[in-house]
């Protein structure tokens, strides 16, 4: 637990140094209006939450990395996420905003962390930070052992390696 806390602090410090805006966690409820890919959704906040906005917020799920859309299993990851949350009421726990203006945080469907679900079902990897296997390492280990989703093939290529070899999807 102590190790994870130190590594989380290092991750937040890296975000500050890299130009990411970090603020206190903001929570809001809303409806998922669009799925960009296996780890990015658009959520329209509820007016009743006092935000005074109904413009959808682009949310990049933290703690995981889903395959690129043009990568093997990329379409399946996006489809699984859409089936799970599209047009559903969710809670966003926004931690920061990245340099592209995307909110960074977690998505909750009731009491379920959607990121944990994606990794457990084999639709994404637990995001690694240096030596830290990430917050969903246990879910990834079990998905690998069961051969779920992208782990049904030996040694699936990490998205960062795929991007390095092929560039971004068009």
Give the location of each predicted region.
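Bacterial N-terminal signal peptides
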Residues: 7-19
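Positively charged n-region of N-terminal signal peptides that target proteins for export
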Residues: 1-3
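N-terminal targeting pre-sequences for secretion and organelle import
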Residues: 130-170
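Electropositive
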Residues: 22-129
């Amino acid at each position: 637990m102590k190790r994870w806390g130190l590594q989380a602090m290092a991750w937040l410090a890296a975000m500050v140094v890299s130009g990411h805006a970090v603020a206190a966690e903001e929570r809001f409820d809303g409806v998922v209006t669009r799925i960009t890919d296996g780890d990015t959704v658009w959520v329209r906040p509820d007016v009743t939450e006092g935000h005074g906005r109904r413009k959808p917020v682009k949310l990049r799920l933290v703690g995981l990395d889903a395959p690129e859309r043009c990568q093997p299993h990329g379409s399946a990851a996006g489809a699984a996420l859409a089936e799970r949350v599209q047009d559903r009421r969710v809670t966003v726990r926004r931690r920061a905003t990245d340099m592209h203006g995307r909110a960074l945080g977690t998505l909750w469907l009731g009491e379920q962390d959607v990121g944990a679900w994606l990794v457990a079902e084999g639709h994404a990897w637990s995001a690694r930070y240096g030596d830290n296997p990430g917050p969903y390492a246990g879910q990834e280990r079990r998905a690998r052992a069961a051969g779920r989703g992208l782990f049904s093939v030996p040694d699936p290529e990490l998205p960062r390696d795929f991007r390095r070899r092929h560039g971004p999807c068009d």
